[in-house]
Amino acid sequence: MINISSIKTHMFCPMKLYIQTHIDTEENNDYQLAIEIKKLKMDIQDLINKNMRKIKKEMTIAEIESELSENIDTFIESSTHAIENMDLNLDPLKINDIIDDTYFNIKITALKIKQAMNILKKDAFAITDMFFPNCMYSYLLKDSQLELIGVCDKIEIIDGKYYPVSIKSSNPPLKGVWDQDAIELVANAILVEEEFDTEVFVGFIYYEKIADKRPVVMDVNLRKGLFEVIREVKEITENNKLPNVKINSKKCINCKYKNKCIEN
């Protein structure tokens, strides 16, 4: 089966997928660390969600921020120790970035909650679903017919309809979403359709750095684009096809495969 992570890697750089598949046979912890970091971020968001239910409409923005922040530091500290004990070479700067992003997100959420409570004249508990719909996290999906498998970061369920959400820590484009993010999302959408016998018309990319959830329409062209990418991934992973790529200074400068790529 093709893992959605292979599609993501191919969309970033086909040569990176080739090297990971056929050349780099050394065991590394990068993938597991990425999973743990993403899980930590989603658990933090879930804790903010729980804290929100205690907010009253008469609270000030500062009080709302304080309430949303309850137990956040303690949770991040304990989770960080757990990850460090896994010997995954966790960079402390990565945790600092997560802390900064978390409190930035809390400030934005506090402003939105205060505005919503003022307009609706309700406590946060009564409007929680506006900000945090019923959802499932890190849901494993697969389709044996498509030979596709992956983990969807989040699936929101609103009025019986399913909305896949991909969570991104990267910088977003000025408008819309990056092509590779859209392709990953439509892959998850198709798997959601198979898993829950439903139709998915819209999904979302959540860009953490600006706390912005952007919609993506799951149209025919995007679905066709996914199948073309799947074909290209199979050419590399199954047929050992060496891809032609152009050097991109922004992508290549920090890539751990830069030297191996030049050799090939």
Model regions: which residues?
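Metal-dependent nuclease catalytic cores that hydrolyze phosphodiester bonds in DNA/RNA
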Residues: M1-I155
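Cysteine-cluster motifs in flexible loop/terminal segments that predominantly coordinate metals
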Residues: S5-I19, E238-N264
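Alpha-helix boundary/capping residues
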Residues: P14, D24-T25, I230-V233, N259
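Short helix-capping/linker segments at secondary-structure and domain boundaries
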Residues: Q20-N29, E193-E199, E263-N264
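Short C-terminal domain-edge/linker segments immediately following a structured domain
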Residues: K39-M42, N49-N51, E194-V200, K234-T237, ...
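Charged/polar, low-hydrophobicity segments characteristic of intrinsically disordered regions
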Residues: D46-M59, M218-E235
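Mg2+/Mn2+-dependent nuclease catalytic core
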Residues: F125-E232
